[in-house]
């Protein structure tokens, strides 16, 4: 994997985002028990096994510097299971409570109607704007129009809810 600084820009932004939230939580809870650690909930929504692996790698990179300062919980959901109403609804509720949602997919892929429906359900359940949405893509591909359309849609979902939106490209982990 290319270890360039640019490759980890979104991860660094998320670390900063978490650090700011951690600082805010610490300031708000000055009188509470010192053993209480802030909890960060993360939901990964992934297209397939390779996308799930990339997302988990990205998640590990983001939390590496912060794991001693706060607790993290992680839920992983595959695009395909989101189409099952009971599972999709459970995933949407969990993701609505998440501090950040990582959507990991292939650059060439368009979001299916079922995945877009799920994104609309999820975004409709967000109560506050303290979340972040991360679009995690594999290495650059040829179909720029497809990814631009998908990223534009995701940015609009985030903008409607007033949540932070990040994009990140991660290179194929199998080439390491």
Stretch-by-stretch model annotation:
Residues 2-39, 114-119, 176:
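Short N-terminal or domain-adjacent regulatory/targeting segments
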Residues 25-63:
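A short, flexible N-terminal coil/short beta segment enriched in small residues
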Residues 38-43, 100-102, 128-138, 164-166:
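Hydrophobic beta-strand segments of well-ordered beta-sheets in folded domains
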Residues 49-51, 81-84, 103-112, 139-144:
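Short acidic, S/G/P-rich loop/turn micro-motifs used as interaction or catalytic elements
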Residues 65-82:
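A short beta-strand-loop structural module common to alpha/beta enzyme folds
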Residues 109-130:
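A short, gly/pro- and small-residue-rich
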Residues 141-172:
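Short, glycine-/small-residue-rich phosphate/pyrophosphate-handling segment
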